[in-house]
A protein has these predicted regions:
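Structured segments of extracytoplasmic/periplasmic soluble domains
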Residues: 59-63, 91-103, 142, 173
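Surface-exposed patches in mature extracellular/periplasmic domains of secreted proteins
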Residues: 67-72, 101-113
Length: 366
């Protein structure tokens, strides 16, 4: 009998210990569940704030691109955004005002959380505030004590945590032109990436488009995406460009390949001269981007070539730049002299490397 009561006592003792352990485990599980639910809600809210910050930064930077579209390179270089700062910030605020995050609508973004500046991927840090020729906008969207109030917790308040701060940042910038629409490349020549890599400063530097194949003429003639890549076909394209019967194809950096002729284009020189004579007097802002009837300013592609030798292959286009053809000298020199210009804006998407020409349609960079 004594052993029986002793056994019952031990069982009751074990039950008590088990109850304590179960109670502790339930508390721990409840804690994990509480934090899991609240962390999940916080992440959903952060995603919503991120979308708001992204949209606000893109909208404001796009307005910056629109402003630049009406300017010459010299005006872009001297542009001070102070006069447009209120407009740029209001555009970002309007995007947020039409959005909600964490169940709250009409999100407010403070002036201090919208910063106009410059983005340079090679710099550290890459974004710096400035109103002098800016190319980027940085936006912070908040649910905290500074703006819109923190989000409320569900179960974490059991542990004394009643609210949580959530923020999201985004930077949108005008970057190197990444696309050229149909007809946007009226000159069937490109510049090797080697020309840019070999120069500490390439802005306003001279380059020859004829003859090519050396450091001074680090360029190549092409027939766009046509075949064959012959001087005869190049002549036909030059003639059709001059008469308005041909338009260059839509070109996307990193995707499109052009067929380069290899430098044997002497028979096409007179056709090059004829195209120059037609284009230099257009001054239409499209085919000829200047107002000087003695020069021809146009966008040309940059092709992926390791040196300045004459290219003879289907070669990927990796970006775009703007050139001014200043003179085409006939016999006896047979020379086409040009220079690369910087601080140009094209109504096109960015996303490409920087070769002196930006796209006015921004992208998210951070």
């Amino acid at each position: 009998m004594r052993n029986h009561f002793l056994t019952l006592y031990k069982l009751r003792d074990r039950d008590g210990v088990t109850a304590i352990v179960v109670g502790i485990m339930l508390a721990i599980l409840l804690g994990f569940a509480a934090f899991a639910i609240d962390i999940g809600y916080s992440r959903v809210t952060k995603n919503e704030l991120q979308n708001i910050a992204d949209g606000a930064a893109l909208a404001s930077a796009r307005q910056l691109g629109v402003i630049y579209e009406t300017m010459s390179p010299s005006e872009i270089r001297s542009y001070d955004a102070s006069a447009d700062e209120v407009t740029l910030k209001d555009i970002a605020k309007d995007v947020a005002d039409q959005s909600k995050a964490g169940g709250k609508g009409n999100i407010i973004i403070n002036d201090d959380d919208i910063v106009i500046g410059s983005w340079d991927a090679s710099a550290s840090p890459p974004f710096s505030p400035t109103v002098s020729s800016p190319n980027a906008v940085q936006v912070t969207a908040r649910r905290d004590s500074i703006s819109n109030g923190p989000i409320s917790t569900f179960f974490a308040r059991i542990f004394g945590i009643n609210t949580s701060d959530v923020t999201a940042d985004a930077t949108a910038a005008l970057t190197g032109q990444g696309t050229a629409e149909e007809g946007g490349l009226p000159l069937p020549v490109g510049i090797s990436r080697a020309w840019f890599l070999n120069k500490e400063e390439f802005c306003d530097q001279p380059i020859k488009f004829y003859p090519t194949g050396d450091s001074e003429g680090c360029a190549g003639w092409n027939v766009y995406t046509e075949t064959p890549s012959s001087a005869s076909n190049l002549r036909d394209i030059l003639d059709d460009l001059a008469s308005g019967d041909y338009e260059s194809p839509e070109t996307i950096a990193g995707k499109t390949e052009f067929d380069f002729t290899g430098g044997n284009v002497a028979t096409a020189f007179s056709d090059m001269k004829a195209l120059f004579d037609v284009m230099k007097i257009k001054n239409d802002g499209i085919l000829d981007k200047d107002d000087d009837s003695n020069t021809w300013t146009a966008t040309v592609p940059v092709y992926d070539w390791a040196d300045c030798s004459n290219p003879n292959d289907d070669i990927p286009i990796i970006g775009f730049t703007t050139v001014v053809i200043e003179e085409v000298l006939e016999s006896p020199t047979h020379t086409i002299n040009a220079r690369v210009t910087c601080d140009n804006i094209e109504t096109a998407r960015g996303g490409g490397p920087s070769y002196g020409t930006w796209g006015s349609i921004p992208g998210l960079v951070e």
